[in-house]
């Protein structure tokens, strides 16, 4: 079996298409992984802040609970906008302020998050019940866990959100 120049070109082109296809797939899955890593980091930050709950200003904050389907990103932004503050109590103040700042950083966006920004039917932040910092953090963690679960289940069911 002799290889002609035409066959070699086809083989090279096929190999390039396969190679480029794997690169595109890998880069899109890395975006999903970045999103999941960031969401898990947010849970860790919430857990860390729960350790310092007595060093937070005991102000009541809007704390979404039982968030409607497709309103998760709206509720997430309510948690990020809340004025969680350190009570300026000594050594822990810096740790608390850095953690609060990290909570307010945006996670890598997803298609679901972009679609949700256009929804006008989600409740406003002011409509949610206000809770003390401890319960606020517990509800925030619960929402993050729900969002991770939804993201993972959408990936396993083939309707990728990222």
From Swiss-Prot:
Which cysteines pair up through disulfides? They are 71-122, 78-125
| Compartments in which it is found | Secreted
Question: Sorted alphabetically, which InterPro entries does this protein's record hold?
Answer: 4_helix_cytokine-like_core, IL-15/IL-21_fam
- One Pfam assignment: IL15
**Free-text tissue specificity from the UniProt record:** Expressed in activated CD4-positive T-cells but not in CD8-positive T-cells, B-cells, or monocytes.
- List the record's Gene Ontology CC terms alphabetically: extracellular region; extracellular space
| Gene3D superfamilies associated with the record | Interleukin-15/Interleukin-21 (1.20.1250.70)
Q: Which residues are glycosylated?
A: 97
What GO biological process, any one, is recorded here?
Answer: positive regulation of immunoglobulin production
According to the record, the residues making up region (Disordered) are: 105-126
The stretch of residues making up the signal peptide is: 1-24
Which keywords has UniProt assigned to this entry?
A: Cytokine, Disease variant, Disulfide bond, Glycoprotein, Secreted, Signal
Looking at the record's lineage, which domain of life comes first? Eukaryota
Q: Which GO terms describe its molecular function?
A: cytokine activity; cytokine receptor binding; interleukin-2 receptor binding
Noted disease association is: Immunodeficiency, common variable, 11: A primary immunodeficiency characterized by antibody deficiency, hypogammaglobulinemia, recurrent bacterial infections and an inability to mount an antibody response to antigen. The defect results from a failure of B-cell differentiation and impaired secretion of immunoglobulins; the numbers of circulating B-cells is usually in the normal range, but can be low.
Biological role: Cytokine with immunoregulatory activity. May promote the transition between innate and adaptive immunity. Induces the production of IgG(1) and IgG(3) in B-cells. Implicated in the generation and maintenance of T follicular helper (Tfh) cells and the formation of germinal-centers. Together with IL6, control the early generation of Tfh cells and are critical for an effective antibody response to acute viral infection. May play a role in proliferation and maturation of natural killer (NK) cells in synergy with IL15.
Write out the similarity annotation.
Belongs to the IL-15/IL-21 family.
Q: What is this protein called?
A: Interleukin-21
Q: Which source organism? A: Homo sapiens
Organism ancestry: Eukaryota, Metazoa, Chordata, Craniata, Vertebrata
